[in-house]
Amino acid sequence: MTKDVINDMKSHMEKSVESLRREYQKVRTGRANTGLLDEIRVDFYGNPSPLNQVATLAVPEPRTITIQPWETKMIPVIEKAILNANLGFTPSNDGKLIRISLPPLTEERRKEIVKSLKKTAEDAKIAIRNIRRDAIDGLKKLEKDKKISEDDLKRAEKEVQDVTNVYVAKVDEVLAHKEKEVMEV
């Protein structure tokens, strides 16, 4: 019974760490990354579609993203969508391909980004601690309902804390990696 609670908790904590990783993919670093364009939707035959479903995205150089639409008539639509997304860069096109050149980040902007990364990481840690609290509440309910003994409860609480520490360390690791990536010139 305690294993079910702990496995459920691990699965929720893993989702929190994955969510943090996905959130960090959207953050602009000194390098180009197609993940920056993940949220952009373009009107494709009346349906708002993700950019990667109407074009091929590539990173040919560290500071350049290229977008090659499958239909050339989509170029102005894609350009407009990128400009409307207000991501801080301007697309240029040569009739077949859209190029986005990312300007280098200033030191001040890098520090702002790191501050934002730390806040997002702290939010992930709070989510993990809330999951821990829910797991401990679930274990206490099992003990109250006499489904597990007090000793089992204490052992399970220790295991819950150990697992929580592992996932908090994972969050710190993801943050450190992204912080290094952002501060790299």
Curated annotation (Swiss-Prot):
SUPFAM superfamilies (alphabetical): Ribosome recycling factor, RRF
Gene Ontology annotations for the cellular component aspect, listed alphabetically: cytoplasm; cytosol
GO biological process: cytoplasmic translational termination; translation
Molecular functions (GO terms): ribosomal large subunit binding
Domain of life: Bacteria
Cell compartment(s), UniProt: Cytoplasm
Alphabetic keyword roster: Cytoplasm, Protein biosynthesis
UniProt xrefs under Pfam families: RRF
Family indicated by similarity: Belongs to the RRF family.
UniProt-listed NCBIfam families: frr
Known function: Responsible for the release of ribosomes from messenger RNA at the termination of protein biosynthesis. May increase the efficiency of translation by recycling ribosomes from one round of translation to another.
Name recorded for this polypeptide: Ribosome-recycling factor
Gene: frr
